[in-house]
Structures are given as structure tokens and as C-alpha cells.
């Protein structure tokens, strides 16, 4: 959420940010409601002052034996007007709050301006794609052939875009989770196993609601929703708290199932493990002082890239443009892994600096030494998406006979060098 005072004093900056991010919000209505609300509050304050003044006169006039009926009538009229204004103020505040929730975060000054993914900028590339001496198979064909992926039975049990992961591939999936968590805890992240049923306030706090509500699975008749990412519970773990400056930065690594309806994703990478309604992900979240958030973002990026390098998976880093960076992001890098069957790079991690956008919505502050509470900055990054990493390992480490060579860094977890039927 943006600071209303900033919106009030910098409407042109906010208007340009809306254009750059491709978001449509009635900014003029926000400004008009803000003016009306402040006028109402000023009038109420004046009326209350007048009522206090008049109420004192009543006692004095009564002692003097004078008629106070006119003054009492005035007090009644003042009370009626205050009630009328209070009712209107609640209406104005509710509408204003709803509109403020629709305002995206402002992009950082060094974020490229662009309408969509065509405006993203590649800033780094690591590793050379493997040259195969045999026809490359997509991971879904490899998995089905070794009886490690079963989409048909998953469709029978649940529906489309779900999967059973079995046998050696299930062990490889579990190995990836353990490797990711071990890698990050060794670098100062505290492991957290978060709840995957989240209330509405938490989704508003992290910024997914109201904009992305249609992409979330909700439990009918309740205030609960399934978690779309561990970012939501990890950020809201400190909602409505004032943190001691000495504990910053806070670093958490959370592992959870992720549930997404992906309402707008029809036809986009919907085969295999790339875009499923349920998947598992390891997530990095940090709470920092504002002046340290840029450094924290690069640390998160380095962690995501470091894990891919240990897996020896070629990747590239993309700086996302304004039109493709997301609603709440101040700055965002996507890490994309090479997928041989696609003959292109596919997103495997998004690393974002949210500045104070989530902290304002969730009311997360810290107290500097000797100062007033200030909003923290929050950051998050996939570390990594497990199903997509499994797919990347399968494709990049496939053998002509359909088996999968296990990356060396995972062998202590799998206790084998090859996955086969």
C-alpha cells in the first residue's frame, strides 16, 4: 500500500507509475475522497468544539435562571450533524481504502519501462546448454515412460494439471527440497514450516488481494483460503508487530505446498510440471531496514543462482520491466533455467524487493534506537520452485535410455547416481 500523504502530494508520480505498470485505478477519485474525508474530519472537530463550548454555557445560564431551550436545541442539531458526518466519513473511508488497495507499488528508478515481457532486460547468463547426441525428450514423456509421473490417474483423482510423482522421481523431488533448505539455513535463514490455510487479512497484508483473488482457491463459506505461496504466511507472521531493530534483518526459509487456480493461464506451459494447480516451493523471505533492502535483494538472487550453479543447470537472470514485474514489486529479478525440450529459458525463481508496500498493508514496523517506529522493507524469492527444478533436472540430465543421472550435489540425499524405471 502506498502512503496516502505521498499520493496526495505526488499525484503525477503515481499517475505515471500506473501507466508504466499497466494498472487502471481512478486516481482522481482517490484524491477527491481524500479531500472530502479531511473536510469532514475538520468540520466534525469544529462541531465538537462548539458543542463543548455550548454545553458549558448551559450550566452557567441555568444557574442564572435563564432559558436554555435554544442552546439545548442547538446542541441537538450539532449532535445530529456530527452523526450525519460520521456516517458519511465511514462511507468515504471505506471507498478510499478499497481504492488504495488497488494502487500498485511504485517501481524503482532503475527498473526499465516496458509494456510486457518484451521490455525485460537480460543482465546475466551462466552455463552452457548441454549438446545432446540423441533426440531430447520433454520431462513429461521421460516421467511417464519410467512410471515416475502419472498425469492420467491424477486427472481421475482430482482433475487436469495435477500429478502423481512416484518412485525415484519422488525421491529426487524430496532430495531437492532437502538440498534447498540445507543450502539456505547454512546461509543464515531460519527454517519455518508455515500453515497452508490462510485468512483473508493475510492475503490483503501481503498484497495478493484484492487484485489476484481469482487465482486463489478459497474454502466456501469461510474466511480461509489455500496458500498460493509460503510468502503469504511468512510475511504475515509479523503482521501488526513492532520489531526490535537489533533482530533485523530477519531471514526465513519456508517450505510449503502452493495452490493456484491459474485462472488466466490456459494454454501456457500447461503440460508436465511447469504450471500445475498444486506444487511445492521453498521460499526465502526477509525483513530489513529500508536502506538495506537493495543489498538483501541481491543476496536473495545470489542464493537462487547459487543453488542452480551447484545443480549445474544453465540459467539467465532477467530484470523485469514495469509492465511485467508484478503488482506489489518495487524491483524484481526472474531467474530462468534452460529447458532443452522447450529450447528456451523458463522461470524458476522470482526475487522481489517489495519496499514498504507489504509492511504498510500488514502494519509491520521496527523501532530504530531512540526513534519512532518505521515500516520495514520486505523481500521474497523462490528458493526454488521444486517441481520446475525437478523438470529441469530431468531434461538436462536425461540419458538416451530414458534414465536420469542424479546431479552430484543431490546424491547424498538420493543415495543413488541414476533414476530409472
Swiss-Prot record:
Record Gene3D superfamilies: Bira Bifunctional Protein, Domain 2 (3.30.930.10), Serine-tRNA synthetase, tRNA binding domain (1.10.287.40)
PROSITE patterns tied to this protein: AA_TRNA_LIGASE_II
Reaction(s) catalysed by this chain's protein: tRNA(Ser) + L-serine + ATP = L-seryl-tRNA(Ser) + AMP + diphosphate + H(+); tRNA(Sec) + L-serine + ATP = L-seryl-tRNA(Sec) + AMP + diphosphate + H(+)
Residues given in the record as ATP binding sites: 260-262, 347-350
Matching InterPro entries: aa-tRNA-synt_IIb, aa-tRNA-synth_II, aa-tRNA-synth_II/BPL/LPL, Ser-tRNA-ligase_type_1, Ser-tRNA-synth_1_N, SerRS_1_N_sf, SerRS_core, tRNA-bd_arm
Keywords noted in UniProt: Aminoacyl-tRNA synthetase, ATP-binding, Cytoplasm, Ligase, Nucleotide-binding, Protein biosynthesis
HAMAP family: Ser_tRNA_synth_type1
Protein purpose: Catalyzes the attachment of serine to tRNA(Ser). Is also able to aminoacylate tRNA(Sec) with serine, to form the misacylated tRNA L-seryl-tRNA(Sec), which will be further converted into selenocysteinyl-tRNA(Sec).
Subunit organization: Homodimer. The tRNA molecule binds across the dimer.
Record protein name field: Serine--tRNA ligase
Biological source species: Symbiobacterium thermophilum (strain DSM 24528 / JCM 14929 / IAM 14863 / T)
Lineage: Bacteria, Bacillati, Bacillota, Clostridia, Eubacteriales
